[in-house]
Amino acid sequence: MTDISEKLDPLVDYIMKNCLWQFNSRGWDRLKQNAGILSQTCEILCGEEPVHETAMDRCYWVDAVILSRAYKARFPWLMAMTKPEIKSLFKALHEKIDHLTVHGSLNTELTVPHY
């Protein structure tokens, strides 16, 4: 697996099929959740300890722990990657998930300002 899309696609597929947090009803909430969960998942996979001081940090941290465990179990090649490679992959993953769940979504409810 040398092409980033070969690594990215199964990670995206897992989130889209198994993670309910991607379905928040407001676009800005989805963006915050994506950033919080994916950044903490990346930190965990890089052997770092995510900051979880606030209630929202802890909420994202729980989902990040679950996602990192699933990724380690299903995609053992992740653990053979270097920290910079993991961070680069997760940057691309974050961009792809933001596009699929918010920016490229046809769900007009995501942009209702009073919702």
UniProtKB/Swiss-Prot annotation:
**One Pfam family of this chain:** AnfG_VnfG
**Has keyword Mitochondrion?**
no
* Keyword ATP-binding applies: yes
Keyword vocabulary terms for this entry: ATP-binding, Iron, Iron-sulfur, Metal-binding, Nitrogen fixation, Nucleotide-binding, Oxidoreductase
Q: Which reaction does it catalyse?
A: N2 + 8 reduced [2Fe-2S]-[ferredoxin] + 16 ATP + 16 H2O = H2 + 8 oxidized [2Fe-2S]-[ferredoxin] + 2 NH4(+) + 16 ADP + 16 phosphate + 6 H(+)
Enzyme Commission no: 1.18.6.1
Q: Name one GO molecular function term.
A: iron ion binding
Q: Which cofactor does it need?
A: iron-sulfur cluster
| Gene Ontology biological-process annotations | nitrogen fixation
Q: Which domain of life is it from?
A: Bacteria
Q: How does it assemble?
A: Hexamer of two alpha, two beta, and two delta chains.
Function (record text): The key enzymatic reactions in nitrogen fixation are catalyzed by the nitrogenase complex, which has 2 components: the iron protein (component 2) and a component 1 which is either a molybdenum-iron protein, a vanadium-iron, or an iron-iron protein.
Q: What is this protein called?
A: Nitrogenase iron-iron protein delta chain
Q: What gene is this protein translated from?
A: anfG
